[in-house]
């Protein structure tokens, strides 16, 4: 059995928004093949690795990825043919060196990530192992609590709330399968609640409902009603998580809540979150402050870090350097993990490991532009991260990840452990 790379082939395919993205196949001398499709975000952090787009307005409004495809089929393939796919760190280092830029702007983070993931999948296939076992070894056994985005706003919907995501977390379930069922039942109860109130039940990019609502906490009221109507207890069995994506509403040093006609300072934004946490069973807030509002983040952690999970997404962009700075500054206590923010599997695993060693949590996440690729489901189990964010229990691009986790839980059998209330290890006094 040889794990040496024999061929690398990239192509342009479509993501869940109908935009082009890159798919990569890596074929080994053993005949085993790994395939990966790279996701794409709508609200992207300024510090993310660069996603290479063509800029040719005559194709896909400039969003084509033929340059990234060419980079894989020519530069990367030439460099990696004959390379050992089982040596992931060396392979990723070779890709990073081949690019030679701080943000992967020469070859594109999408090109590099596609090859990085496809190589790992090919090596796993060669060893006859599922990806989670290949990456995580014998200790990979924790099934994550899903953060289910059941109401969308911000960049993921139009004419909705200022804030981007309103999620539920079934922490009280005994298994992933049960938690997923609870979430799906609440999702359907929410649809009826929204419909009965006379609002639209259209959905956003990630499958959550996106009605036009008068205030930013109106979705929380609807979600609370839906949880109870589905027969569950908010604040006991089900908690709420938020991703307001506040970088999108941050301008000239202030936070502009257009839905409410208010402009807030960093300190006032922190007080806004403190008030919401006191009124609703919120367990996690992601990007509660803008990506470069470091003082605001420190204040937020000092006010709420002992009670809830404070997740950095645009703030940290899966970047070890920014994560290390945030740990030292006591800003946030959790990192969102998005493979394409940093652009390689090795760098992603390094960020997760640093977070876990530092007493932080790591939440493995999709992007709003997704596909049938289920890599993140295996990744979250491989790293025992305990939390996954992959949308509503709707749309095949989201459901694919949930279904893969159901398969993994079944395969693990009695060894499978649902993270449940133990997922929030960064909070001094967890649930």
From Swiss-Prot:
Record keywords, A-Z: Cytoplasm, Glycolysis, Lyase, Magnesium, Metal-binding, Secreted
Pathway membership: Carbohydrate degradation; glycolysis; pyruvate from D-glyceraldehyde 3-phosphate: step 4/5
Molecular functions per Gene Ontology: magnesium ion binding; phosphopyruvate hydratase activity
Residues the record lists as binding Mg(2+): 243, 286, 313
Residues where (2R)-2-phosphoglycerate binds: 164, 338, 367-368, 389
UniProt cofactor note: Binds a second Mg(2+) ion via substrate during catalysis.
SMART domains: Enolase_C, Enolase_N
Cited PROSITE patterns: ENOLASE
GO-annotated cellular components: cell surface; extracellular region; phosphopyruvate hydratase complex
Entry annotation: catalytic residues: 206, 338
EC number(s) stated in the UniProt entry for this protein: 4.2.1.11
Function description: Catalyzes the reversible conversion of 2-phosphoglycerate (2-PG) into phosphoenolpyruvate (PEP). It is essential for the degradation of carbohydrates via glycolysis.
Name the UniProt record assigns to this protein: Enolase
Organism: Chloroflexus aggregans (strain MD-66 / DSM 9485)
């Amino acid at each position: 059995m040889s794990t040496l790379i024999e061929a690398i082939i990239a192509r342009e395919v479509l993501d869940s928004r109908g935009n082009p993205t890159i798919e990569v196949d890596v074929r080994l001398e053993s005949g085993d093949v790994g395939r990966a499709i790279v996701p794409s975000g709508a609200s992207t952090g300024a510090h993310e690795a660069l996603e290479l787009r063509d800029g040719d307005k005559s194709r896909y409004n400039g969003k084509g990825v033929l340059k990234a495809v060419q980079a894989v089929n020519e530069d990367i393939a030439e460099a990696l043919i004959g390379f050992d796919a089982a040596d992931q760190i060396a392979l990723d280092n070779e890709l990073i060196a081949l690019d030679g830029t701080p943000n992967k702007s020469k070859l594109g983070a999408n090109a590099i990530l596609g090859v990085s993931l496809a190589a790992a999948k090919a090596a796993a296939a060669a060893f006859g192992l599922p990806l989670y076992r290949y990456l995580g070894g014998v200790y990979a056994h924790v099934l994550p609590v899903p953060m289910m985005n059941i109401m969308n706003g911000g960049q993921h919907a139009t004419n909705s709330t200022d804030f981007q995501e309103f999620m539920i977390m079934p922490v009280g379930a005994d298994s992933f399968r049960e938690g997923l069922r609870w979430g799906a039942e609440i999702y359907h109860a929410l649809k009826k609640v929204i419909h009965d109130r006379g609002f639209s039940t259209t959905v956003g990019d990630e499958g959550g409902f996106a009605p036009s609502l008068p205030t930013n906490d109106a979705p929380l009221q609807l979600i609370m009603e839906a949880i109870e109507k589905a027969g569950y207890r908010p604040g006991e069995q089900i908690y709420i998580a938020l991703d307001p994506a506040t970088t999108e509403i941050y301008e000239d040093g202030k936070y502009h809540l257009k839905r409410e006609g208010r402009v807030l300072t960093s300190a006032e934004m922190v007080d806004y979150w403190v008030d919401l946490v006191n009124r609703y069973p919120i367990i996690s807030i992601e990007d509660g402050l803008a990506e470069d509002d470091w003082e605001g983040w420190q204040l937020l952690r000092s006010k709420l870090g002992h009670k809830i999970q404070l997740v950095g997404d645009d703030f940290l962009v899966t970047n070890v350097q920014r994560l290390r700075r945030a740990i030292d500054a006591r800003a946030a206590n959790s990192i969102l993990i998005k493979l394409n923010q940093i652009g390689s599997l090795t760098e992603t695993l390094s960020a997760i490991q640093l977070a876990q060693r530092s007493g932080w949590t790591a939440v493995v996440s999709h992007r709003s532009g997704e596909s049938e690729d289920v890599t993140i489901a295996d990744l979250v189990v491989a790293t025992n991260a305990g939390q996954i964010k992959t949308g509503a229990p709707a749309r095949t691009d989201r459901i694919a990840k949930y279904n893969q986790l159901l398969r993994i839980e079944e395969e693990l059998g009695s060894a499978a452990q649902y993270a449940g209330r133990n997922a929030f290890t960064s909070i001094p006094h967890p649930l």
